[in-house]
Amino acid sequence: MVVVMLAAEEPLASTPRRDMDCVGKANTNKKLVQARLPFKRLNPEPKECNEPKRTKGPVAPKCSEPSDQENDQDSSSISHHGPALVNGRGPLDCFMSRRKRSPLRSAPEATIDLTEDSNDSAKQQPAPPIAATCPLSEEKTKTSEGTTEPTIPLTEEETEKDEAEDVDALPLLDITQDSDTEEEEEEEEEEEEQQQEAEVSHGNESVLSTGSTSSASVIASSPEPSKSAPTTPASTSRINAANKVKRRSLKSVQEQEEKQRQRDEKERLKQEAKAAKEKKKEEARKMKEEKEREKKEKKEKDEKERREKKERDEKEKADKLKAKEEQRQMKIEAKLEEKRKKEEEKRLKEEKDRIKAEKAEITRFLQKPKTQLAPKTLASACGKFAPFEIKAHMSLAPLTRVQCEDSVLEDLDRYLAQPDSTLNGLKDWTGHKPRSSGPTRPRHSAQGDCVVITESQKADDGPDRSRYGRMKLLHFHDNYRPAYWGTWSKKSTHISPRCPLRLDKDLLDYEVDSDEEWEEEEPGESLSHSEGDDDDEAGEDDDDDDGFFVPHGYLSEGEGALEDEEGGDPEKQKVRQRMKAREWENELMSKGKVKVLEAVVRGCFWEGEKPLPDFLQPYAVCMLEPLSKDEASTPEQDASRQQRNEKLLTMLLPLLHGNVNSNKVIITEFLEFCRQQTSSPTESLLNTTESIPPRIHVRRIIKENAVYEKRSTFKRCCWYVHADVLARYSQEALPVPCQWSYLTSGANVTRDEHSGSQGNSPTTNSSTTPSNKRKSASSHSITKYMKKCGESEQTEAMETDGFQADTEDDEDDDCIIIGEQSGSSEQDINTSLPQTDRETEPMDTSASETAALALPCPTPATA
């Protein structure tokens, strides 16, 4: 039986795993070996091409050859171990890849003739070295290159077995990842096959001839190439077969150990990865627990701080409440002490009254008892009703409400005496409309705000309660302040009997606690040890007088005897005493009455009829005569005025430009400078009449030619003269801040001014005038009390008559408002002093300055 094996180009690289694990080697030529059993000779048919061809068609039928029991057994064993081919492809063909191989030199094929004498040495042909692709046998492959494979005499069954084992021994891709149990089963099957091979080889030894040549085994599929050995005789075939089986078993054991080692390594790596992962998880868990613990500790700390703060606040609040309660208790105790003192004083007073009453009982017989009328006499004299007094707020109803004529009354009497039977009284009664009468209380006209009071009119007993309302006592039980006693005439639109607890925020302010605003008056100076004794004694005397009060007109027995003896008229004396008694009663009653202040209207008084009363003289209106109008200005006056303004501006520029003071200080300094220039005999720039200009004129010049603002040239706000004005007067080189030597006190001198001056002003001695003394106190700058404003706010120009460093109250000091006429024109308003020429230029004045401009303004020299 001929067994043909088609070896792949790279059997170890056919699977993906072997392709990845192994290193690429040079392709080796595969050879087809034909083995002939005894009594059967086969002619070797060498392949033209080293590449084996695979048939895609059906497999050729087996040739019918005589077979024995051993061959049948071998074939059955081979068919049992190897699966049948389907369409010429085995189970491993799907894992093999076809690659285009480079043409290699053809290797000679070895033909083994088993019929020849076994004593002859087998003809050996050099076989090309087979390069193993497995990395585990790489070194062995390198050592075996260039050596020839030894041929071992084997039987056909052994050859087939070896080929089948070689095919089975090819490293395949572990697709299913078999478990350890399957691997053990495979190992057991391999051991059984090895035992069967050993038995078969032992049984064939008697059949095979000793001189036959053993067929060459295909070693291309073996992972480890065997070393070249000389052909042995037939007696050594059993040993070689045993060695081969042993080598293969050792190889499988090594592979299993390697696999086991790889599995252990993989398991170890897996365990290490798992341990690392567990360690990482444990660290993450510990970190998370640490964070949670820190968070919890922080939360507990915050909660503790919050609780401590709350307790501290509650404690402070409790202390405040306790202090407030103690203060309240002290006030209550003080009030109770005061009340106790008052009760003690009241008790002492009652004791004194009792003593006085006892004294009065003793001296009561001295007083003349008053005669009282008997009740019967009073009832008979007054009738059913006792007399009563009609007070100011009372009025009696009229006696007859319906005023009837006598004829009507007579008809009524006649009808009552003899009623008419023809008349239907019921119809008359139902059809008759009753007459209506006016109100019982007569109407009084409402009094106006102005009440005319004559000199002879007497004061009323009290205010008219119908007009001012009833007196009310408003007191709350939880208040310390005294109750309110007075009138309350306001009516609420929200509070009503149905809603007594509604809030009325229009009339009452519920946010303010009036009890907290109440402060008890401090006790006055105690006069109990100094003047109080005299007062008490005087009070006791008054009490005694009240107890033994004798009204005017009362004469004890024997008092009027002298007057009668002198010949006085007793009737006149009684009338005189009665009048004195009435005056005395009026005087006593007027002391305890409440009088209402009422407005007194007097007038009207017409002019020219009578001289005005003296009490109206303080309120008389002063009639002012209009001011005389000046003549219109001429061009010559305008030119002279313009020239004077230019001279003033020329003198004012060194003082004004770069000055940090207000216009009030600048004007005062400039006027003082002009005054000293006038007093100097050599330097007199102006006439005597025009020497000192008015303040308002200087103010207008400053307003027209300069602005008060902050620029980059200086860090503070100061006066800056317009650039065109400086260019017109050739004063562009004026320093900022100004270097003026001040003649007056109170000016705010900057730091740069202390270093020196440029001599822009005369070096005259500073003289203090009365006007400077008067204004020195009010000329202090308040800029040092002000905070610095922002850059954007400082760059804005400020009006000269608006915000200044000082309060401008010059007009109030120098000008007096006399009057103003609505019909006066602007020309009349702009009149000025006789010392200065009349201004023709219209001035920009506000409504408040209009009256001030119309009046003559005295200068500091004339003030």
Swiss-Prot record:
Alphabetically, which GO biological process terms does the record hold? DNA repair; DNA replication; DNA replication-dependent chromatin assembly; nucleosome assembly
Where in the sequence does UniProt note compositional bias of the Low complexity kind?
144-154, 205-237, 760-771, 850-863
Which residues does the record list as Phosphoserine (modified residue)? 118
Q: Where in the cell is it found?
A: Nucleus
GO CC aspect terms: CAF-1 complex; nucleus
Pfam families, sorted? CAF1-p150_C2, CAF1-p150_N, CAF1A_acidic, CAF1A_dimeriz
Report keywords, A-Z: Cell cycle, Chaperone, Chromatin regulator, DNA damage, DNA repair, DNA replication, Nucleus, Phosphoprotein
Q: Where is the composition biased (Polar residues)?
A: 821-835
Give all Phosphothreonine modified positions: 111
Q: What is its main location?
A: nucleus
Q: According to the UniProt record, where is the region Disordered?
A: 1-353, 423-466, 513-579, 749-863
Q: Where is the composition biased (Basic and acidic residues)?
A: 42-54, 254-353, 457-466, 569-579
UniProt lists compositionally biased (Acidic residues) regions at 155-168, 177-196, 513-524, 532-547, 806-815
The function of this protein is:
Acts as a component of the histone chaperone complex chromatin assembly factor 1 (CAF-1), which assembles histone octamers onto DNA during replication and repair. CAF-1 performs the first step of the nucleosome assembly process, bringing newly synthesized histones H3 and H4 to replicating DNA; histones H2A/H2B can bind to this chromatin precursor subsequent to DNA replication to complete the histone octamer.
The UniProt entry's sequence similarity note says:
Belongs to the CHAF1A family.
What is the protein named? Chromatin assembly factor 1 subunit A
Q: Which organism is it from?
A: Danio rerio
- Source taxonomy: Eukaryota, Metazoa, Chordata, Craniata, Vertebrata
